[in-house]
Amino acid sequence: MTMYAKNNTAGKDMLSLLEWNKEELTDIIKLAVAMKTNPAHYSHILSGKILGMIFDKPSTRTRVSFEAGILQLGGQAIVMSSKELQIGRGEPIKDTAHVMSEYIDAIMIRTFSHEKVEELAYHAEIPIINGLTDLHHPCQALADLMTIYEWKDQLEGVKLAYIGDGNNVCHSLLLAGAMVGLDIRLAMPKGYEVDETILATAENLAKESGAKIFVTVDPKHAVADADFIYTDVWTSMGQEEENAKRLADFGEKYQVNAELASVAKPDYHFLHCLPAHREEEVTAEIIDGNHSVIYQQAGNRLHAQKALLAAILEAK
């Protein structure tokens, strides 16, 4: 009867997207669109469910969207930082995972080490959601796919150019795109490439889905005829000491500006996961212009994560 019961996804983790298949991801996106269109219909489906949220990194979009999302579905959230928990004083992750599994229904964690999230998931008896690690940002990728789907009514064959650092956002975008059949072009300077293992995994996924993956150091080559142009900050949290070098290494060549965007399709859309540094990775003219859909994209974090929560928490 309900879309969220289509696949047996109850209890699944969301660590890197690789726990899910193409059909399951597509169902999440379609459910997210349905929830956005008719939120009242889903307002009680997670009644009685509790989401624990652990933050080791500052957050605006992840915290507010997850907390609002579980509330809008009838559940509740408990927000914590590692400093407030015994894990911050040396308690083993194993013990924390088992104990929290006795109290709540799922954990969303935003932290630095991806291995920490994997260890938490290994020991927990409840679903674990990666709210961001240094290696992956799967929930952002869900919102990205949703935004693309809303504009194109499809995912297969859509041309997406990512310009900038081969970081966690890029990793998840690459994996998601490879799973659903996007035409992905990556442009980044030497020394800032995506993780080799993740690229190899994406290339294998692309063989199954029909996705295309192209990597270059030439931004104009990547952006040529693109439907979407995506970028992210050149200096992420924890890399502040590298900022001067990074600004020099990326420079104007990798900035998304009017000149670069001119080779994309005339009706292209601009994406950015935020927060943004205007006049660094993107000009104000582009990010605040008519082609930009960054606020729709940010808003879709809410809807995509609501769909994810419904899928893993056995929605009523």
UniProtKB/Swiss-Prot annotation:
It catalyses: carbamoyl phosphate + L-ornithine = L-citrulline + phosphate + H(+). Keywords: Arginine metabolism, Cytoplasm, Transferase. GO terms for biological process: arginine biosynthetic process via ornithine; arginine catabolic process to ornithine; citrulline biosynthetic process. One of its GO terms (cellular component) is cytoplasm. It comes from the Bacteria. L-ornithine binds at N168, D232, S236, M237. GO terms for molecular function: amino acid binding; ornithine carbamoyltransferase activity. Reversibly catalyzes the transfer of the carbamoyl group from carbamoyl phosphate (CP) to the N(epsilon) atom of ornithine (ORN) to produce L-citrulline. PANTHER family: ORNITHINE CARBAMOYLTRANSFERASE, MITOCHONDRIAL, ORNITHINE TRANSCARBAMYLASE, MITOCHONDRIAL. Belongs to the aspartate/ornithine carbamoyltransferase superfamily. OTCase family. This is Ornithine carbamoyltransferase. It comes from Listeria monocytogenes serotype 4a (strain HCC23). The lineage of its organism: Bacteria, Bacillati, Bacillota, Bacilli, Bacillales. The gene is arcB.
